[in-house]
């Protein structure tokens, strides 16, 4: 029997355990990276098609549109498509189809990821305690085809309902953002760029918190084998009793994401300088592709490390509720 509370109070050990469990199940990292890349690639198809459609309507060259600033590209596409209702409907239908199909794929992949990480954390033992042995990593590796199928079969329908709720929440946030940016200002002091800046910061914060709660709901649904609504009180209890630890893990994961982004930007800039060197610049393209692959895998690894860490915190909270029998009655002792 593993002592789940031995390292519960240590952020360092919790993150270390999450990283080791994720590394042991490296197959899940690659699966999620491939699925995320496929989703983004499919999403680019209707967008590129929209650019070509706009270029054909205005009689220009699609490559000339790509040389514009992103804001100019978006404004040009919106202006042209609004003037062509049929083209706008076709573009929105294609974009919506890809979004729906890609989202369903990502829900299935996340069901696999959470199932594997739950099993890995359950059987890993005190893997975060030194010395680290290869046998411990092999024991924590729970990635196999049978578990993948089991995860999709048992969690997909619930994750799909949860994802629909997430989509509705995103739509409400987007509507509120558009109302704040394009609607009449509440006060004269909030007019102009200040309103856009505050609304953008508020949207980023709201999306981060929504994604955080969404991830916790996914974990609790899988760990407790319950429905979406039944998972809500479990998440509320987890946040109430482990708010500090959860906040520290979230801050650590976001910091790692920012560091990885900074390193990626520096690497891209350095490779961009190499591209101007004759002959040597030929090596820039494969290096850029390699850097992109490494960046994508690192991002998925960091994200899944957060999932594994939250799984651990949830299990320690569940283990802190110990049934005790006294005078023939069952009492519950909470940590």
Per-segment meaning from a language model:
Residues 1-335:
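Hydrophobic alpha-helical membrane segments
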């Amino acid at each position: 029997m593993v002592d789940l509370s031995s390292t519960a109070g240590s952020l360092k050990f919790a993150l270390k355990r999450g990283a080791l469990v994720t590394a042991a199940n490296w197959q899940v990292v690659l699966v999620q990276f491939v699925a995320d890349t496929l989703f983004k690639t499919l999403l680019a198809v209707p967008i590129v098609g929209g650019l070509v459609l706009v270029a054909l309507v205005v009689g220009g060259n699609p490559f000339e549109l790509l040389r514009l600033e992103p804001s100019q590209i978006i404004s040009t596409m919106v202006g042209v498509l609004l003037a062509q209702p049929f083209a706008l409907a076709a573009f929105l239908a294609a974009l919506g189809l890809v979004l729906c199909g890609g989202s369903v794929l990502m829900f299935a992949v996340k069901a696999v990821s959470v199932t594997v990480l739950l099993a890995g954390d359950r059987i890993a033992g005190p893997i975060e305690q030194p010395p680290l042995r290869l046998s411990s990593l092999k024991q924590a590796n729970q990635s196999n085809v049978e578990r993948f199928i089991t995860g999709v079969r048992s969690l997909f329908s619930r994750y799909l309902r949860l994802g629909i709720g997430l989509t509705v929440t995103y739509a409400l946030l987007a509507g509120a953002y558009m109302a704040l940016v394009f609607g009449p200002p509440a006060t004269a002091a909030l007019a102009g760029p200040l309103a856009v800046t505050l609304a953008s910061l508020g949207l980023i914060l709201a999306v981060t918190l929504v994604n955080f709660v969404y991830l916790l709901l996914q974990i609790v649904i899988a760990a407790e084998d319950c429905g979406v609504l039944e998972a809500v009180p479990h998440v509320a209890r987890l946040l109430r009793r482990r708010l500090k630890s959860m906040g520290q893990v979230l801050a650590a994961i976001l910091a790692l994401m920012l560091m990885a982004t900074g390193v990626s930007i520096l690497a891209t800039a350095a490779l961009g300088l190499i591209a101007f060197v004759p002959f040597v610049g030929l090596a820039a393209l494969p290096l850029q592709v390699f850097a992109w692959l490494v960046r994508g895998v690192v991002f998925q690894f960091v994200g899944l490390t957060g999932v594994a860490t939250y799984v651990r915190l949830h299990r320690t909270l569940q283990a802190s509720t110990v049934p005790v029998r006294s005078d023939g009655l069952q009492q519950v002792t909470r940590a």
